[in-house]
Amino acid sequence: MSELLNAVEEGGVVAIEGAPGRPVLGSAGEVDRVLEACFAAGCYAALLYAENLPAAFFDLSSGDAGAILQKLRNYGVRLAVVREAAAGGTSVRFGELMAEERMRSDFGVFASRDEARAWLAA
């Protein structure tokens, strides 16, 4: 692992976690870092904080969210993102994406780490 991505086991569920408040992915193309960490830990779950993601992730027109989510889906990795509810910079289209994602079980955005971990454990 690295100092930015670590395997954390809680309640029998192992997930790769990003370091809170630290940038991990500068671009969508760097999602391989998350996949490599998952493969090394033998897990299929990741918990990242909004600050770990590319700055434009929550602006759907950037393509970052789509590229990252598709790559993780291709490998069966579930992603939980912790983001304050009041955080700005979310496009209208991202809200539409979240409405669609609620019908799936491989991506979610949560207000707290505890909520994100509970979802990954479900």
Feature roles, as predicted:
Residues 2-122:
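Amphipathic, Lys/Arg-enriched alpha-helical "gate/interface" segment within cytosolic domains
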